[in-house]
Curated annotation (Swiss-Prot):
Domain YjeF C-terminal: 8-299
Keywords: ATP-binding, Lyase, NAD, NADP, Nucleotide-binding
Binding residue positions for (6S)-NADPHX: G113, H170, D240
Recorded catalytic activity of this chain's protein: (6S)-NADHX + ADP = AMP + phosphate + NADH + H(+); (6S)-NADPHX + ADP = AMP + phosphate + NADPH + H(+)
Binding-site residues for AMP, renumbered to this chain: G239
Gene: nnrD
EC number of this enzyme: 4.2.1.136
Complex formation: Homotetramer.
Protein name, per record: ADP-dependent (S)-NAD(P)H-hydrate dehydratase
Cofactor needs: Mg(2+)
Database matches in SUPFAM superfamilies: Ribokinase-like
Enzyme class: lyase
Single Gene Ontology MF annotation: ADP-dependent NAD(P)H-hydrate dehydratase activity
Amino acid sequence: MPSIETQSTSPPPLRIPHREASAHKGNFGRVLLIGGSRGMAGSIALSSIAALHTGSGLVAAAVPDCILDCVAGFHPALMTIGLGDDGEKFADPAWQSLKDRLSAQAAIGCGPGMTTGSGGATIVEGLLAKKDLPLVLDADALNIIAQNDWLSDGRFERSKADAACVLTPHPGELQRLTGASAKDVDAQVEAAAELACRLGLTIVVKGGPSHVAYQNGDGGKQVWQNTTGNPGMATAGCGDVLTGIVTSLLGQGLSGPDAAKLGVWIHGRCGDEAAARWSHAGMTSLHALDALALVADEMTQPAD
């Protein structure tokens, strides 16, 4: 096992960047969340709204046309981009409509609710080639990568000159990516650390507790262990909220490891606030999302 850096229950030393009085929305990152399908509109909506509440100045959701109106109705500040679909999910031409919009983004998150069809696969494949854009990959984006064995063909490798790439798998997704059993936490953390170090990625190993694996400054394996969060967060949509938080932090200029560590800590703190009010059994991802704005404010860098 690599050495594990354990964060105490006090707030981590990382902070969301301070907001100057003269700032405008363009100073806080334009981010794009990509995903959703018929029956899974809530996933991409949760991610996108989480990015708004974490402080992103502008957030857009790129979704199949068939769910555009549904996703747009979740929040009036959320911009939406409709892409070609087959009536259920992204169709193959969706990437051609999307790719010219990417250069304006400070960070991109992809995967929540997307399904693993060929249209989604074309989008993920295109994003992997854009190594100048900070990227978060979650959910079905990870399943697509596992199905196509894209971790082993070189397209994932990141140098220090490339933008950050953060993966946020749950245990089942990590098993599909690495072969490490979802029932063996130590094996999963070790596999994530090896993969992160080999390819220059940051990997969030979601669980109780969650870990963040990344390459340290000496090129070795580093693992950080979080201490916020609770079993009530094992509920639909909580992972989607994390995707939005980490994407927002990347868009505000944090590095991959810092965005992942601070994002996981904030996410768990939101879950703790929700559980205190609604109970472990009764809380939902919406309750965690409701706590996010105040928790993010607490974690913002104060003025000098």
